[in-house]
Amino acid sequence: MFVILNSTLKAEWWIGVVMKNYNQHNLVTFSNSILKHFGVKPFHQTEEEVDKVLKGHKKVALVLFDGMGQNIVRKHLKEDSFIRQHYLHTIHSTFPPTTSAATTAFLTAKYPIETGWMSWAQYFDKYKRNIILFKNVDYNTGEKVEPANIANDTIPIKTILELIKENNKDVHAFSVRRYPVDEDGPKTLRQFEKRINKTLKGLDECAIYFYFDSPDYEMHEYGIDNKRVNKIVNKINKIIARVCKKNPDTLFFTFADHGHINVKFLDFCEHEDLYSLLALPMSFEKRTPTFFVKEGKQKEFKELFLKYYGEHFILLSKEEALKDQIFGEGETSEVITNFIGDFVATSIDEYCLYASKEMKKFDLFKGHHAGNTQEEMLIDISAYNV
C-alpha cells in the first residue's frame, strides 16, 4: 500500500490510521492500569482488558521479554502453546518501538515526549555527542562519557514501582533485570526462572517487574527466522508455564517492548549532496533517524531525502511530529523537544539508514526494530492465574 502512495499521502495515512490506534492501546495505558490497581492516580487512560483481570489480585508479576512482540510469539509458538493459550489483548509499543523508549514508557506510565527517553541514542548539545541512554556511551565513537549518568541527570524519571511503594508501604514493588542491567541480575533463563520463584515466595502484596533481554539479543545477531530464536522462545514458553504453576497466588502478565523484523541497510553517505546538508550527526535510530539540518537548507533536504528514500521512509518536520504527537501526548519541555532535529524519518519496510562516515564501528544487524511496521509495533499481552 505504502509504495503506491506519494510521500504526503503516506504521512497522512500513517498519522490518521496507525498513530490513532497507537495512542489508544499501548504500553503506557497498560502501565497506567497497574498504577490504578495499586491505588495511584493514573497519568493517562488505562487498559480496560487489563483492569478487568487485575481485580482482586494482590500479587502481580510483570514479565517482559525484549523483542518478543506479537509477530515473534505467533511465528515461533504454536496456537496451543502456554503463552498463546493465555492471550489477553494486543497493544502497541511506543513510537519509535525501541527498548529505551518502550521500557521507560512502561516503567513510568508516561509517553516518550513526557520522559525524554525517546530512542536508543540522543544528541546532547551540552556534550556535543550522541549518547546511548542506557550505556552512557558515545554512539558514534563507542567512548565512555563523563559524567557517569548524563541521561538520568538530564531527563530523570520516577517509576511506577516507586510511586506504588510511596502510596502503600505494604506493597513490595521493585524490579529484577538480567545482568548486566542489574549487577546482581540473573545471567541465564534458568537463573531467571529461579529468581522469579525466589522473589515471589513469601510475599503477600507485590508489583514486580521482571526483565530479560532475549529473544531481542538473538534476533539482532541471527535474524527472526533462525533456529536459535525458535529454541529460546519455546524455552521461554516452558519457563512461564512452570513459574505460573509454582506461584498460583500470583497474577502474571507476559509482554514485550516491541517486535522485530529482518532488515537491510542503506548508507546515507552515498548521497553526498544530501549528507552534506546535515549540521550534526544523525541521531535516534537507524529505522527512525532524526536530522539536524544546516540553516536555510530544510527545503533542499526534504526534496533530496524524498527523492532518494521516499519509497522506504516517511519524512516529517519537527513541527509535524510534535503537532501529530507521534511521540505520545502529555506535557513536555524544551529540554526534551531539543532532542528532535529538523526532521524525523521512519521506515515503512525493511530498510535502515546509517551514516558510515559518522561511525567508528558499525554492526550490520540481521534483525532490528524501531521502525514503523506492524511487526515492530504490535505486542500481545498474555495473563495467567487470572
Stretches found by the model and what they are:
Residues 2-4, 8-386:
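Feature captures the catalytic ectodomains and active-site-proximal regions of enzymes
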